[in-house]
Each structure stands twice: as structure tokens, then as C-alpha cells.
Amino acid sequence: FKDLRKDPKWSFVKLNPNNQFAEEVAEKKPISELATVGIYFFKSGIDFIEASLEMIKNDDRVNNEFYTCPVYNYLIKKNKKIGIYEIDINEMHGIGTPDDLLKYNDLMDFPKSRDQPT
């Protein structure tokens, strides 16, 4: 989705000049207006595992944590074609932060649990 505010809570993708495939991805660092929703698909499980292991071996962390999105950079370096499916920002609801989850719960009119602040 396009995040015109470029909120650094998301992952971002920069497309190649033809706007066909990902040229680079970044976690928590806006490199374009295209943010990801945190749902990833890997055509090959072994590609995911090998790229993940390489990321871990390189200690490629963000905020001292490993994330899934940067795995794609390792696949891009191997000339793998990484595509995106763009959705409208109004068709997704982030739930990656406590505030996002509370907003989503309010939107869906879910009852508040005892553990949630009121």
C-alpha cells in the first residue's frame, strides 16, 4: 500500500525503474512510499531458509531484531525476481503495535479483554 506519511513502523519496498520488481526492501526505514503489510510469500522454502541463514550469519538486524522483510534483499542479490501486490491503504489494518491492535479492535467492535487498557 502507499503510505504517503512514510511511517517508519512499516517495511518498505523500492521498485526497479520499470516498476516491475523489487530493487530493495527496508525494515522500519522509508525508502519509498510503498509499505508492506507483513504478509510474505516465498516460491521456494529453501530460498527462504538459505537467505534467512545468510541474513542471520551477517547479523543483519533492525533494532536488534531479525525481521522477515530484509530476507528479500538477499534473494534480490541472487537475481531472484521479487514482485509485489499493491492494495489500497483502506483495505488493510495494521496490528503490529499495541495502538494499531486497539484501533482494529475498536473498528471491529471487539469486546475489550481484561488485560487491555480502557
Where are these regions (language model features)?
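Conserved alpha/beta core of the MobA/IspD/sugar-nucleotide pyrophosphorylase nucleotidyltransferase superfamily
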Residues: 34-118
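Conserved core of the sugar-phosphate nucleotidyltransferase
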Residues: 1-59
